[in-house]
Amino acid sequence: MSTNLLRLILLFITLSITSSLSTPSPADSPPYLWPLPAEFSFGNETLSVDPTVTLIVAGNGGGSLIIRAAFDRYMGIIFKHASGRGSLLSRIRFLKMVEYDITSLKIVVHSDSEELQLGVDESYTLMVSKKNEQSIVGAATIEANTVYGALRGLETFSQLCAFDYITKSVQIYKAPWYIQDKPRFGYRGLLIDTSRHYLPIDVIKQIIESMSFAKLNVLHWHIVDEQSFPLETPTYPNLWKGAYSRWERYTVEDASEIVRFAKMRGINVMAEVDVPGHAESWGTGYPDLWPSLSCREPLDVTKNFTFDVISGILADMRKIFPFELFHLGGDEVNTDCWKNTTHVKEWLQGRNFTTKDAYKYFVLRAQQIAISKNWTPVNWEETFSSFGKDLDPRTVIQNWLVSDICQKAVAKGFRCIFSNQGYWYLDHLDVPWEEVYNTEPLNGIEDPSLQKLVIGGEVCMWGETADTSVVLQTIWPRAAAAAERMWSTREAVSKGNITLTALPRLHYFRCLLNNRGVPAAPVDNFYARRPPLGPGSCYAQ
């Protein structure tokens, strides 16, 4: 067990003795950081932070607009109270030369590249100390190889800062701090589903913003499904006739803005177009995509037009989504009506195909379309289970149904994303945070070379029973449990009693989300997203 983790456990034991008497006070409790950094040390000092703290940048990437925008964003979070940054009181304090321990934040970024792809370096070092004989001015310093590592460091810095209601100032407890941090997995995702229920642009942005607080880095956008097709596709403009209404749609500009907004927070957007099943809505605008009026999905495998439409959709989407991964679905394909539709049945017989052969033909042809547009295909696990040896070797398999699929996929040389429905499907409201937290993506995979093929994991917010009114409180705080599992070291999340090492911090993180305007539900809910049963502190629900 690491020294840092042991120190935390001892501190949490102390906290648990007094937690029934009062709510946590940052000054009297261990560091409430989420997710837990890889390596860190801290002391016992309390430092004050100047509300006019200045940004100092250095390195090839220090001048990035991403850094400047993030600094301004986080200063608004840290100094949001009336006596905070930009307020009259802060200006008076400045004029009176009130002395603060932390007066500047230095951000050093070594690379000037802002390319955001799978595996981008998100490591950072954060140092916070007061002025002393060697330092005339107190400072905090974040050093990172990329702007995206600096973003993660800014989030950690913001979590160290707490507003003191007595002194009406922002303070950092347990200083000095030295943190060296990096993620365990390069892919840490959250799926949203805008087909089952339309989510307005501002709600999607709020989800993305909240993801950045937990250091998640991939938004898996399940844009379309059998119920609705809300996205504008200029090459085939009738497709979005499959939207629920004229007002529940996304323009090309909307989608581009979501991608831009996400990139500013170090988050990739992976789009999904699920084929050949889950596609009934396509035929609202183009009925020829249906095998027949009584067989509306899977899509018609016999027609070149079907694949022309897929190619057109992907060509349009390639202009919007720069991320190297593109999800082609391929799950839950019921082919019964293919064999009961005359022209499809004749097509199958002419090629000596079974319906399973036709399913494989469809998936592989769709993969080649995606690859031709410089995308790496991602498919749900049924494609691997049904015809894994025929999939393109570049395919990333996403697990959802069978617990050992990642074990089997990596053994065959495929990369895998873990998102087992029993634990990481957020629409399963009866799964408590403990089960989410304790679920390990690498279980059963002992070979380090195969472990590397599990690129990460994803919690899935399927939309059948979640719309704008409840989506954020269904996501949070349970998504945070998976976020720490994917970011922090395996040792840190697997050792000790999580009611001591994780629960107090998760309570605090839930309240942090609430304070930042995210309606995260109580941690100790028997059913997710249920409101509190009675009065009480945010830190004890």
Swiss-Prot record:
Glycosylated position list: 44, 304, 340, 352, 497
InterPro entries: Beta_hexosaminidase_sua/sub, Glyco_hydro_20_cat, Glycoside_hydrolase_SF, Hex-like_dom2, HEX_eukaryotic_N
Record keywords, A-Z: Disulfide bond, Glycoprotein, Glycosidase, Hydrolase, Signal, Vacuole
GO molecular function terms attached to this record: beta-N-acetylhexosaminidase activity; hexosaminidase activity
Tissue expression notes: Expressed in roots, leaves, stems, flowers and siliques.
Listed GO CC annotations: plant-type vacuole; secretory vesicle; vacuole
Catalytic reaction(s) noted: Hydrolysis of terminal non-reducing N-acetyl-D-hexosamine residues in N-acetyl-beta-D-hexosaminides
Intracellular or extracellular location(s): Vacuole
Disulfide bonding pattern of the chain: 295-337, 511-538
A Pfam match: Glycohydro_20b2
pH influence on activity: Optimum pH is 4-5.
PANTHER family with a match to the protein in the record: BETA-HEXOSAMINIDASE, BETA-HEXOSAMINIDASE 1
Task of the protein: Has a broad substrate specificity. Can use synthetic substrates such as pyridylaminated chitotriose, pyridylaminated chitobiose, p-nitrophenyl-beta-N-acetylglucosaminide, p-nitrophenyl-2-acetamido-2-deoxy-beta-D-glucopyranoside (pNP-GlcNAc), p-nitrophenyl-2-acetamido-2-deoxy-beta-D-galactopyranoside (pNP-GalNAc), 4-methylumbelliferyl-2-acetamido-2-deoxy-beta-D-glucopyranoside (MU-GlcNAc), and 4-methylumbelliferyl-6-sulfo-2-acetamido-2-deoxy-beta-D-glucopyranoside (MU-GlcNAc-6SO(4)) as substrates.
Family: Belongs to the glycosyl hydrolase 20 family.
Protein's UniProt name: Beta-hexosaminidase 1
Gene (name only): HEXO1
